[in-house]
């Protein structure tokens, strides 16, 4: 039990210091929480953008692979039957 006479948390100065420290801690925690939310939002946007760009690149790669297959067939035909191109 706290004794009267200015000792312990009953002292107005100590209470003021404790309240100020509590507010500083709450502000710090609030800032951390806000920054974590911002980071999370950024990561969600980054994931969506990255998925979209990768899907676009995948489509372009598929088109290039098909074109390459056609060219390989044409080269193969030209090598086995060169008279077609003369």
UniProtKB/Swiss-Prot annotation:
Chief location of this protein within or outside the cell: cytoplasm
UniProt superkingdom: Eukaryota
GO MF term list: identical protein binding; protein-containing complex binding
Single GO cellular component term: SCAR complex
Record-linked Gene3D superfamilies: 1.20.5.110
UniProt KW keywords: Coiled coil, Cytoplasm, Cytoskeleton
Coiled-coil zones: 47-81
One GO biological process term: trichome morphogenesis
Compartmental location: Cytoplasm, Cytoskeleton
Subunit details: Binds SCAR.
Family: Belongs to the BRK1 family.
Biological role stated in the UniProt entry: Involved in regulation of actin and microtubule organization. Part of a WAVE complex that activates the Arp2/3 complex.
Name of this chain's protein: Probable protein BRICK1
């Amino acid at each position: 039990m706290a004794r009267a006479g200015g000792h312990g948390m009953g002292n107005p100065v100590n209470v003021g210091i404790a309240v100020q420290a509590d507010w500083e801690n709450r502000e710090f925690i609030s800032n951390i929480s806000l920054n974590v939310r911002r980071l999370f939002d950024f990561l969600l946007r980054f994931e969506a953008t990255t998925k979209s760009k990768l899907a676009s690149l995948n489509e372009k790669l598929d088109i290039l692979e098909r074109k390459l297959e056609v060219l390989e067939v044409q080269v193969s035909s030209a090598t086995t039957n060169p008279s077609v191109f003369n």
